[in-house]
Regions:
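S-adenosyl-L-methionine
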Residues: 1-21
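Weak global preference for isoleucine
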Residues: 7-8, 14, 25, 45, ...
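A short SAM/SAH-binding and catalytic strip from SAM-dependent methyltransferases
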Residues: 15, 19-36
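C-terminal substrate-binding/active-site "lid" region of AdoMet-derived donor-dependent transferases
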Residues: 32-79
Length: 79
């Protein structure tokens, strides 16, 4: 993946933060949390954002699935 020199990492509660100022988000959440955030993530993706989720997928949402060298999966959701 291409990386920019302008990367800023912010750590915050994904349940509280407004995602409109972010172009990409990276999460490692359990199934329950992914389900709870489904609508928020779908809106974010629809508005051009990209969600990278390590191990857990976004329920009933089409995305790209990559198997990593450690055997775990990375799910990528974008428009």
């Amino acid at each position: 993946f291409p990386f920019s020199k302008d990367i800023i990492f912010e750590v915050d509660s994904i349940f509280k933060v407004d995602l409109k100022n972010f172009t990409k988000i990276y999460v490692f959440l359990d199934e329950k949390s992914m389900f709870a955030l489904k609508k928020k993530f779908e809106k974010y993706i629809k508005n051009g954002g990209v969600v990278y989720s390590y191990v857990y997928n976004l329920p009933n949402t089409t995305g790209r699935e990559i198997e990593l060298s450690n055997g775990k999966k990375l799910f990528i959701y974008k428009q």
